[in-house]
Structure formats: structure tokens, C-alpha cells
Amino acid sequence: MKFNLLFILLIFQFSFSQQRTCKSNLQMKKIMNNPIAKQKYLDLQQKFGVELSKLQNQQNKSAINTNSRNNIPVAVHFPNVATNSTDKSCLRQLVQNQIDILNADFNATNSDISLWTPTVSAIYPRTNIGSLNVQFILATQNHPAGTGIANGQVAVTFGTNFLSGADEDSQWRGYINIVVRVAGALGYSPLGGSPNDGSTVVINYDVFGSGTGCTGYVPQGDYNLGRTLSHELGHFFNLDHTFGTDQCLPSNTDEVIDTPQCKGSGGCPEIGSVAGCVAGEKSLTMNYMDYTDDACMYMFTAGQATRMRAYYNAISSQLFTNVLSNDSFQFKDFALFPNPNTGSFKISFKPETNEQIEIIVYDISGRNIYNKTFQNSGMFDQELFLNTISSGVYFVNIQNGESKMVKRILVE
């Protein structure tokens, strides 16, 4: 009898662990039950509505600011980590890995976006891929007083009782705050976060980032590619689940015109195999705002991107700009070509200082695949050969003294 009970419990635990869970609906109930928080939320939603109307009323949708990429300051917090320097170093790398994933997912430069083929898009005739055109960047300057983080260090905190278990902290207002801890689900976020209040996106410790992770923070199972944060940050930028309240009713909508009405999907269903609520339509199971596995979600829609852009416009004045270093920095006479390429490309620019030049290339998981230091001869002009790497998106970090820039390349 004991054996049978133990077996049942193990099966239950395994089954539960296979289903994506998100507590954002519970988070919203807490907000709506607090009169002050509710009014703040409604005020911000009203502002969002104005911004959304502006975008939707533009005759030429390409006039939306697509040429200038907006930088968004991020701070990441590990409340339960001690001060071990090795752990800190590993977690900072894991944080950057997760930031790189966000930047790829929100800008449609993720390598698996190639799965959206003409054959797949034909199944969803009114749906196009969307890009928010933003850059999430770890803050490095003017950190909040008393945090112990010096200028030049990234905004990653360790082992402090950040928020005292709450879900916002005014000390960290002006940032997108990500808290990595035991979340009671894969993660959660308010539906429309407020940087002014220090709102947070909470992520469970075992679904943060990708790869081998760090001690106590190893990405696990079907949610090991960092897409949980893409999902939850979608909520922060005012996106609901594609399946809304998970009912096929006329009133059930995510307020996005190009996501078919549907019920939620889990696991990794074959593309086009899940029927939508409207006859002839299929559920957009590969969308970040569904409940499918990390490996089986890879896109936002153009309608979702417009909605997120409107929300960004509504909160952009709340985001601090003085916490990012070299916001618009670019080396003089900089060129990187060809891009896309087959693994060989040329970099040229005029260095800012007489110091050495370091080139580091990371893959989309944050793995360092190239690292070389060059002597400075007054004009940098080098061809890099990465012919043994597989196709996909890579990030080229170029540093000369305190000057640093990052460029994204696509290897075909």
C-alpha cells in the first residue's frame, strides 16, 4: 500500500511538472482587490489605450518607430544566493544568457524563427511575425543607494531579502525587475507592469536562462530555453494569454486581432493540429503567450508587437535612462560585413583608446565560442573565421578600454 501511494504521488508530481503554469491571473486578482493598486492599474491602462489608438490609427504601420531601437534597463535579483564569488560569477553569466534570449525573442532574431515557413504561415493567413524593436540591457550606472553595487557593475543582486517577499519595491523603481526564486509556478507578472512602483517579473529558479546553469539554478525539463521569461515579460508589456480565460466564448479574447481565438495548449503539438474556437482556424501553439514547451514556442505576432509597443510608449517615461552606460555608443567608422554570413565576416573601426581590443562571440545560449585579444595599431581591420559553427544567431562583443558595443550576426 505504501509503495502504491508513493508511486501515485510520483506520477502526480511528474504530471504536474510537465504542465506550464503561470500565476499572472492570481497576481491580477491581488491588484484588483487593492483599491490603490487598482486605480494605478486603471490609470495606466487608460494611458495605454490612448497610445494603442495612436498606433492603430497610423495609415502606414511601418511608420511605427522601427529604425530606432529603444533601450530598456533591467535589474535581476537572486534573494536566496549567498556571497560566494564563484556562484556570483556564474549567475551573472546566466543572467546575460537570459537577457540575450529576451532580445532575440522580442526582436524576432531567435534562430528558431526560421520555423515560420511559408507552409506554416499559410495555416494562419491573417498572422505575421512581430518585433518589438527594443534592447533589454543590464543597468550599470547610478544604482539605488544602499545596494552595494558600484558604478560599472551590472545590476544583479545576491542574497538580500529583496522585496521582503513582496512583488514590488520602490527602491528599484525605473527598472524592469526580474526576481529569481521559488515562485510557486514557473513564473508570474502583472498584466501591465509599472516601473514607477518597482513592479517585478518573478521566475522560478529552475526555468531561468538556458544551458547548464549554475549551482541551484539549472534550467530543467521542457522549460530549459529561457522562454518562461519571454512569456512573463509579455504579460508585463500588457499581453494576455492567447487563450484568454480558456473558453470558446465570444467574450473570451486576448484583445489581439491576429491571434486566433483558442483554448490553451500544453506540450509540443504538431503545428496546425490544434483547432481554434472558430471553424477552420488553428490555435497558434508556437506563440510565446500559449502554454507550450520552450522548444515549441518561437514567435510574437505583429498585433502583439503593436500592443507591446503601445504599452512601452505608455511607460517609457517611467524607465530610467541614466542607469545605462554608452546607450548609443558606436565606434567611429564601424563596419561589420557581410551580415548574414557563413561564419566568416570582417570588422573594422577606429578604436577609442590605445588599449587592446577584445572580441568575444557568444551563441544564443550564452556560450562563449570565440575569444581573442588584438593589439591596437590605430585602425582595427580584421576578418574573423567561425566556419565550424552551426547556423543561427550570434552576438559579437567588441571592447576597447571602457568602450564596448554588441552586434548581432546571423550565420546561415
Question: For the regions a protein language model found, what residue spans apply to each?
Answer:
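Stable alpha-helical elements in mature extracytoplasmic
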Residues: 91, 95-98, 225-229, 301-307, ...
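Hydrophobic h-region of N-terminal signal peptides that target proteins for export
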Residues: 8-17
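N-terminal zymogen propeptides
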Residues: 18-69, 106
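Fold-level signature of zinc-dependent metallopeptidase catalytic domains
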Residues: 55-106, 181
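C-terminal outer-membrane/trafficking sorting elements
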Residues: 329-337, 341-412
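Metzincin-family zinc-dependent endopeptidase catalytic domain
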Residues: 97-269
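Sec-dependent signal peptide recognition
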Residues: 2-8, 391
